[in-house]
């Protein structure tokens, strides 16, 4: 056949997970096919027109550090940029951008169309082909068969998607797009563990019918930040403000009076929604004591009047939506361009995934994005990059990769999913990471770009820029450690201005930089400071953070070293935990269900106690001793009722 039908990797779906997956696989060198039901919607922002935020911005920076597209596309399409938590410590600072939907989508499509090794094709996928426990390809809705040893499914909300507006509902993948019914049915045939989740979106408003004069303006930051490590502020288009208004008691009364017409509160919707992005009816019900909730009016783009009212996601009937909107100050005459709605969809239990995001059930089948129970563009993009990369690595016969929890928020995300699963849509927060002081936005490249280069994800341009930055940080840090500030040479008035008090002894300049209010640029003005100071803001930022937080980071690294021992202790994949005597039935059942790969993963499964982990360590040591002695350890119990360990661990 002249038309290509055999590929190394096939990616199904062109959202944020699918586009990053396809780009990652192609960058590594795999012949990659991206299948989408509509090429015009590649990279589409289905819900809110924003990228980043607390925890989410960290993921975007990590995707960027690994050569992904999201941050760079946001720099080209972002119409407002802000640093959240700017007054707090660097660990929780996060970048957030409003994006022009059209510009963002164009930036993503440009990268897809110009990526070597990547083919785009417009066809919905109806079937997966498998042979035994291996995936072999896909079949489209018109019967076209494409073969590949690795398939990445990034179906978003399309699998058996059902949209609800009031008590009316209809099948759709999102508003205006068809659902993936046949593919959803095929996945059920494969007996993969699954469930239903739901998410929602607010009505869109016409800016020409809004009175912004009675609202609080929310401008972006000045100077304007960038998202990508390679980004420049000059790439940004025109910047626009957002606006803030509030619900009121009348708004709440309207909602309460119509809860019986809500599909959520009338029992029509079965899926669980996102806890941290609740609908307005959910807010009124859960926070009944609050008399007002913020609403952020976000522009959808530079060439449209459409406004996204962040904070009033709803599935109430349209007449109620209109009454709710017009009860809000500044929106008394607002015209709704698109109704809000809720959507239910199938997801698959991520505990059935390996850390590579390959399913445990079928070799070569990878899942990424909302299909794994997550919510958010950023979480999807990060999973997509990892799944696409591992699909390509597998085809090339290379080892799979996933960062550890202490290496990246991506590692935290994947580990949470595969060990704990989800009972509601999963959203990333900085609070989910144990080692967040080391997992900052600003050092994502220092943490991940070298690994990205090793995997084949990072191109020459990014690598050269990274090496220049890394080397500059190392050189300047070494100079500051070698240079001394002498009390006799530094006038007291200058010392008080820069470091807060006169010098009573000699200090290395790096020591002085550790002081809370000491800034690098001012420190370099003191007599004895190294000549030709650094000028790159990213280099200076890393030097200052390293100096001021070194003690905390060192302590955290000590904790990491202890945890690594558990993470590197492998558990047999075929271990029947019911044979490990001393474990409670509950723990045995949970370990047999989840089949953790390491002792560290086992300890993060809900209900598995520290005592159970200690007992498993005893079991592993006894097994190793038996193996060293040449004994058959296949039936080796962890405890046989004898010894102190057996007594202590009984009933764990």
Curated annotation (Swiss-Prot):
<dbReference type="Pfam" id="PF21680">
    <property type="entry name" value="GIDA_C_1st"/>
</dbReference>
<dbReference type="GO" id="GO:0030488">
    <property type="term" value="P:tRNA methylation"/>
</dbReference>
<feature type="compositionally biased region" description="Low complexity">
    <location>
        <begin position="631"/>
        <end position="640"/>
    </location>
</feature>
<protein>
    <recommendedName>
        <fullName>tRNA uridine 5-carboxymethylaminomethyl modification enzyme MnmG</fullName>
    </recommendedName>
</protein>
<comment type="subunit">
    <text>Homodimer. Heterotetramer of two MnmE and two MnmG subunits.</text>
</comment>
<dbReference type="InterPro" id="IPR026904">
    <property type="entry name" value="MnmG_C"/>
</dbReference>
<dbReference type="InterPro" id="IPR036188">
    <property type="entry name" value="FAD/NAD-bd_sf"/>
</dbReference>
<feature type="binding site">
    <location>
        <begin position="273"/>
        <end position="287"/>
    </location>
    <ligand>
        <name>NAD(+)</name>
    </ligand>
</feature>
<dbReference type="Pfam" id="PF01134">
    <property type="entry name" value="GIDA"/>
</dbReference>
<dbReference type="GO" id="GO:0050660">
    <property type="term" value="F:flavin adenine dinucleotide binding"/>
</dbReference>
<keyword id="KW-0274">FAD</keyword>
<dbReference type="InterPro" id="IPR020595">
    <property type="entry name" value="MnmG-rel_CS"/>
</dbReference>
<keyword id="KW-0963">Cytoplasm</keyword>
<feature type="region of interest" description="Disordered">
    <location>
        <begin position="631"/>
        <end position="652"/>
    </location>
</feature>
<keyword id="KW-0285">Flavoprotein</keyword>
<dbReference type="InterPro" id="IPR049312">
    <property type="entry name" value="GIDA_C_N"/>
</dbReference>
<comment type="similarity">
    <text>Belongs to the MnmG family.</text>
</comment>
<dbReference type="InterPro" id="IPR044920">
    <property type="entry name" value="MnmG_C_subdom_sf"/>
</dbReference>
<dbReference type="GO" id="GO:0005829">
    <property type="term" value="C:cytosol"/>
</dbReference>
<dbReference type="InterPro" id="IPR002218">
    <property type="entry name" value="MnmG-rel"/>
</dbReference>
<dbReference type="InterPro" id="IPR004416">
    <property type="entry name" value="MnmG"/>
</dbReference>
<comment type="function">
    <text>NAD-binding protein involved in the addition of a carboxymethylaminomethyl (cmnm) group at the wobble position (U34) of certain tRNAs, forming tRNA-cmnm(5)s(2)U34.</text>
</comment>
<keyword id="KW-0819">tRNA processing</keyword>
<dbReference type="GO" id="GO:0002098">
    <property type="term" value="P:tRNA wobble uridine modification"/>
</dbReference>
<dbReference type="InterPro" id="IPR047001">
    <property type="entry name" value="MnmG_C_subdom"/>
</dbReference>
<keyword id="KW-0520">NAD</keyword>
<feature type="binding site">
    <location>
        <begin position="13"/>
        <end position="18"/>
    </location>
    <ligand>
        <name>FAD</name>
    </ligand>
</feature>
<dbReference type="Pfam" id="PF13932">
    <property type="entry name" value="SAM_GIDA_C"/>
</dbReference>
<dbReference type="InterPro" id="IPR040131">
    <property type="entry name" value="MnmG_N"/>
</dbReference>
